[in-house]
Swiss-Prot record:
GO biological process: DNA replication initiation; double-strand break repair via break-induced replication; mitotic DNA replication preinitiation complex assembly
Main location, first listed in the record: nucleus
An example Gene Ontology molecular-function term: chromatin binding
Keywords: Cell cycle, DNA replication, Nucleus, Phosphoprotein
Top-level taxonomic group: Eukaryota
Composition-biased stretches (Acidic residues): 168-205, 449-461
Organism: Saccharomyces cerevisiae (strain ATCC 204508 / S288c)
Region (Disordered): 168-227, 442-462
Protein name: Cell division control protein 45
Subcellular location: Nucleus
InterPro entries assigned: CDC45 (IPR003874)
Modified-residue entries (Phosphothreonine), positions: T453
Miscellaneous note of the record: Present with 1730 molecules/cell in log phase SD medium.
Self-association and partners: Assembles into a complex with MCM5/CDC46. Interacts with MCM10.
């Protein structure tokens, strides 16, 4: 079943009712540990439940195998389970092997609705919805953003019609079995041997062989009509599931809608909402662009007039200020913020010498000496900083950078400084990716004596390495969680530093890829395979691989051919002898995003990867909540990609 936006408070009150009457913890939240939007949404929920004196347990989870393991370990007394950031695209009842009848405690005689001793709530913005969760289950309860009521009318009708037709077919089969038994063994055997290709002939043959003709012409006609309807409705559902995946909303925005409904909005929750939504800006710009005006209105509503406010060392404010498509401008130099910006790099091709010359000429045209541009922003000439917006407006059009200025959200932390939402998201993402130390210095793996181990031992060793790596990601989740606290400024600064280091590594890897021409054009998609490099270990983390992929995709969007081709990006992990593979959708050049906001480009890699895995003997692990990210054995990559190229699925 599902809750529309106006019904979120009903679900919340139900959770509260079931969880607040016990002295022990009855509420568990499973959260995707590599998802900033899910992190911020869970933080809001945690603060809300804490205010209501409801005990809850938060469990960061990496992928589906961990989901199954953690679910199997839940205590029987857990009556509410929230899945945040995942769960919407799979049949949860089947995957978790849930028998709803085991949990039934009451049934309403009039409506037929059942009450369960455990309810599973799904907060997930990935689409398409799995329709079994939405229409076929009462124990699975999904928070919907309007997708179901607005766009799934045809699919809803097809789903319920198929259920009715299945029941009718079951009744007919029971009736047919009884008649077959009355007709004798010989007749049944003869009927089984009929293999006519034409369905009509088959039905008539079966009817004739049953002697006294228990199936009349009307029954045959009904059967044919039923088969036609089943085929038609199955086609509707197949088309729905094969359309491709995307993210249609911010989970943080959905939780904030709940808070608005129950009167619990404040600046802290709004800031978390802004961070969660901003985290989608790079990969799902249409979602951010749609939600931005709503966030802007909410900031104006909750923020007191600056004329009446007095700044103190502990004042926490949230304002709308000019922001830029530049990398960590307030925490680096103007030059570096241009140089390491994905947007500027793609527009000016900074990865080659001509691009660097254009950048230097641009600063000269703006009247900003390179020596001044390379000063840390904090110490840069204040007159230039004050006039920066005007300088940009006058000079950046000729370089295609006219969209570099936009309004953004800035959080002021008293006398400790200020940070924009986009910069905060960069810091959080870096903490999720790297944590307390650089990836290369952590999780040291001993590769000694690998030649002396047999295949089974190597597999066990690889599994253990993967487990250790995922434990680190869970640890990084809690580091990012703590960084959301306004008092943990040192963690935030650590994240800023890590983000700068990561972006340099991404830039260096991206430049090497473009200079060596490692991106291959394979008719229907672009392919890039990383097999060496000083920063190769960084790309064991899906977030870092996607960071590199977004850098490359943006460069491709601004390239001369400007073909809207998706990309497959693969990186070798020598420790496990596998490739981490990500399928990325193409991207419109910046400036064209607003034209296409109503029709986002869907990711077809999820279905393609699953289908090709089913058709081949390749050892593939599809475990990530981002289903377009897979792990594949080294020797299986080439045949897998060959099959993908010829499949016609993209």
């Amino acid at each position: 079943m599902y809750y529309g936006i106006s019904q979120f408070s009903e679900a919340y009150n139900k959770i509260l009712r079931n969880s607040s009457s016990h002295s022990s913890c009855q509420l568990v939240i499973f959260v995707s540990c590599l998802n900033i939007d899910a992190l911020c949404a869970t933080k809001m929920l945690s603060l809300l439940f804490k205010k209501q004196l409801v005990q809850s347990q938060i469990v960061p989870i990496f992928g589906y195998s961990e989901l199954r393991r953690h679910y199997s370990q839940l205590d029987d007394n857990i009556n509410s389970l929230l899945l945040v950031g995942f769960g919407g695209v799979i049949d949860l009842e089947a995957f978790l092997e849930i028998d709803p009848q085991e949990y039934v405690i009451d049934t309403d005689e009039k409506s037929g609705e059942q009450s369960f001793r455990r309810d599973i709530y799904v907060l997930d913005a990935h689409r398409p919805w799995n329709l079994d969760n939405i229409f076929g289950s009462q124990i699975i309860q999904c928070f919907d953003d309007g997708t179901v009521d607005d766009t799934l009318g045809e699919q809803k009708e097809a789903y319920y019609k198929l259920l009715e037709l299945d029941e009718e077919s079951g009744d007919d089969e029971l009736s047919g079995d009884e008649n077959d038994n009355n007709g004798g063994d010989d007749e049944a055997t003869d009927a089984d041997e009929v293999t006519d290709e034409d369905e009509e002939d088959e039905d008539e043959t079966i009817s004739n062989k049953r002697g006294n003709s228990s199936i009349g012409p009307n029954d045959l006609s009904k059967r044919k009509q039923r088969k036609k309807q089943i085929h038609e409705y199955e086609g509707v559902l197949e088309e729905y599931y094969s359309q491709g995946t995307t993210v249609v909303n911010s989970i943080s925005a959905q939780i904030y809608s709940l808070l608005s409904a129950i009167g619990e909005t404040n600046l802290s929750n709004l800031w978390l909402n802004i961070l969660g939504t901003t985290s989608l800006d790079i990969a799902y710009a249409q979602v951010y662009n749609r939600l931005y005006p709503l966030l802007q209105d909410e900031v104006k509503r909750l923020t007191p007039s600056s004329r009446n406010s007095v700044k103190t060392p502990d004042t926490l404010t949230l304002n709308i200020q000019p922001d830029y498509y530049l990398f960590l401008l307030r925490h680096s130099s103007l030059y570096d913020s241009f140089y390491y910006s994905n947007y500027v790099n793609a527009k000016l091709s900074l990865w080659n010498e001509n691009g660097k010359k254009r950048l230097h000429k641009m600063f000269a045209r703006m009247g900003i000496p390179l020596s001044t541009a390379q000063e840390t922003w904090l110490y840069m000439d204040h007159s230039i900083k004050r006039e920066l917006g005007i300088i940009f407006d006058k000079n950046l059009d000729r370089y295609g950078l006219q969209d570099i200025i936009r309004d953004g959200f800035v959080r002021t932390l008293g006398y400790r400084g200020s940070i924009s939402a986009s910069e905060f998201v960069e810091a959080l993402t870096a903490l999720l990716e790297v944590g307390n130390s650089t990836d290369k210095d952590s999780v040291k793996i001993n590769n000694d004596n690998n030649d002396d181990t047999d295949g089974e031992e190597e597999e066990d060793n690889s599994a253990q390495k993967l487990t250790n790596l995922r434990k680190r990601w869970v640890s990084n989740f809690w580091l990012s969680w703590d960084a959301l606290d306004d008092r943990k400024v040192e963690l935030l600064n650590r994240g800023i530093q890590l983000a700068q280091d990561l972006q340099r590594a991404i830039f260096n890897t991206g430049v090497a890829i473009l200079e060596k021409k490692l991106i291959k054009h394979l008719r229907i998609y672009r392919l890039c395979v990383l097999q060496d490099g000083p920063d190769l270990d960084l790309y064991r983390n899906p977030l870092t691989l996607l960071r590199l992929g977004n850098w490359l995709i943006e460069c491709c969007a601004e390239s001369e051919d400007k073909q809207l081709l998706p990309m497959v990006l693969a990186s070798i992990d020598e420790n496990t002898d596998t490739y981490l593979v990500a399928g990325l959708t193409p991207r419109y050049p910046r400036g064209l995003d607003t034209i296409h906001t109503k029709k986002p480009i869907l990711n077809n890699f999820s279905m393609a990867f699953q289908q090709i895995t089913a058709e081949t003997d390749a050892k593939v692990r599809i475990d990530n909540f981002e289903s377009s990210i897979i792990e594949i054995r080294r020797e299986d990559l080439s045949p897998f990609l060959e099959k993908l190229t010829l499949s016609g699925l993209l």
